[in-house]
Amino acid sequence: MQVTFLGTSSGVPTRARNVSAVALRLPQRAELWLFDCGEGTQHQFLRSDLRLSQLRRVFVSHMHGDHVFGLPGLLASLGLSGNSNGVDLYGPDPLESYLQGVLRNSSTRIGYPLKVHRVRDAAEQNLIVFEDKDILVRCTPLTHRVPAYAYRVEQKPKPGHFNLERAQRLGIPPGPVYAALKRGEQVSLDDGRVVDGRDFCGPDRPGASIVFCTDTVFSEAAVALAAGADLLIHEATFAHSEAEMAYQKQHSTSTMAAQTAAEAGVGKLVLTHLSPRYAPGNPVTPNDLLREAQAIFSNTILAKDFLSFEVAPRCNSS
């Protein structure tokens, strides 16, 4: 899985940072998933190497404008391109009526299947939001001024490495039989033998896991959702010195994000959703927020627009 940050500012864009959007590229299935879609996100697509035509799912954290104002335009542009097989959207209860209102009142027609899924029940009852043979998505409620949700994306474990030498030594012919054995299936051979694929594969290889967490003040629910994740993307709107304001506005400080990462035991923390106040001229800079977080959780980096990297399971990464 590859993560690309398309917007890392909170509230309003700045010269260096657009508002919230994170893309998740799934190369093996030629799909792109999007987490939040602030104003101008489709412009950010044009400045990146991402292909909007691959967009398959959008996960919305909450309905504040800096997280959703870019969604109608992006969906409309995707429709004009004429090469979408459909998009599924996941988010708070008002998401569907918001989109319907904007698209209807702007006389915009979406020429592809568009389905909206409410996540409130799944979040409150610890149910699965999305699942297929490769990936599982869960979510949890956050603590914010409006209903907000964090999302966890997990790749399911894959079969262990196939012992080709053993298969050859036992005279098992190559071809479709090998593919079935690699999947851990039981296979009947032409000579009457029955072989079990599990005897030819090593231990299952765990998949990568990513958690997207914004907007919220420090939340035990977020800690639980992020437990053991390889990557935690967490908002850090304010510096530690402005913790009182963070509580008032129901946002996180850099140290709250780091505390979440430390308690959850994640592999890496990325700080995003920075207040535009930390611009040139302010004695407090984004690097100060980074240092505050690293004092609590050392493997922390600072997001910037178009930062992109691969996410791999810690046990498999070099």
Curated annotation (Swiss-Prot):
Give the catalysed reaction(s), semicolon-separated: Endonucleolytic cleavage of RNA, removing extra 3' nucleotides from tRNA precursor, generating 3' termini of tRNAs. A 3'-hydroxy group is left at the tRNA terminus and a 5'-phosphoryl group is left at the trailer molecule
How is the co-factor bound, per the entry? Answer: Binds 2 Zn(2+) ions.
Q: Its domain of life?
A: Bacteria
Give the first-level EC class, as a single word.
hydrolase
- Residues at the active site: 66
The coenzyme or cofactor needed here is: Zn(2+)
Which amino acid positions bind Zn(2+) 1, per UniProt? 62, 64, 144, 215
| Keyword terms, alphabetized | Endonuclease, Hydrolase, Metal-binding, Nuclease, tRNA processing, Zinc
Listed InterPro entries: Metallo-B-lactamas, RibonucZ/Hydroxyglut_hydro, RNase_Z/BN
Residues annotated as binding Zn(2+) 2: 66-67, 215, 273
What Pfam families does the annotation carry?
Answer: Lactamase_B_2 (PF12706)
User: EC annotation?
Assistant: 3.1.26.11
Q: Which CDD domains match?
A: RNaseZ_ZiPD-like_MBL-fold
Record GO terms (molecular function):
3'-tRNA processing endoribonuclease activity; zinc ion binding
User: What HAMAP family does this protein's entry cite?
Assistant: RNase_Z_BN
Q: Which PANTHER family match?
A: ZINC PHOSPHODIESTERASE ELAC PROTEIN 1
- Record text on subunit structure and interactions: Homodimer.
Q: What is the recorded function of this protein according to its Swiss-Prot or TrEMBL entry?
A: Zinc phosphodiesterase, which displays some tRNA 3'-processing endonuclease activity. Probably involved in tRNA maturation, by removing a 3'-trailer from precursor tRNA.
Protein family membership: Belongs to the RNase Z family.
Name it: Ribonuclease Z
